[in-house]
Amino acid sequence: MARYFRRRKFCRFTAEGVSEIDYKDVVTLKNYITESGKIVPSRITGTCAKYQRQLARAIKRARYLSLLPYTDLHK
């Protein structure tokens, strides 16, 4: 009986000691959105609730200012 152990998820922002997530940091924000432009949930990324809220707010601001696309699937 082989048991599969998942690697424990951790909040990258807490580990790095980030005080606030910046909406201008597009490279970091792109890691937390899917190919279709949706925000990846914290149960997938392991981000804690405090930083997930900041992340969502930063992504929405970046979209509004056209730093990030709303979707990548424009035809």
Curated annotation (Swiss-Prot):
Oligomer status and interactors: Part of the 30S ribosomal subunit. Forms a tight heterodimer with protein bS6.
PROSITE patterns referenced in this protein's UniProt entry, alphabetically: RIBOSOMAL_S18
InterPro entries: Ribosomal_bS18 (IPR001648), Ribosomal_bS18_CS (IPR018275), Ribosomal_bS18_sf (IPR036870)
A GO-annotated cellular component: cytosolic small ribosomal subunit
Superkingdom of origin organism: Bacteria
HAMAP family, A to Z: Ribosomal_bS18
Alphabetical UniProt keywords: Ribonucleoprotein, Ribosomal protein, RNA-binding, rRNA-binding
Source organism of this protein record: Psychromonas ingrahamii (strain DSM 17664 / CCUG 51855 / 37)
NCBIfam families per record: S18
Function of the protein: Binds as a heterodimer with protein bS6 to the central domain of the 16S rRNA, where it helps stabilize the platform of the 30S subunit.
Family indicated by similarity: Belongs to the bacterial ribosomal protein bS18 family.
Record-linked Pfam families: Ribosomal_S18
GO molecular function, one term: small ribosomal subunit rRNA binding
Protein name: Small ribosomal subunit protein bS18
Gene Ontology BP term (one): translation
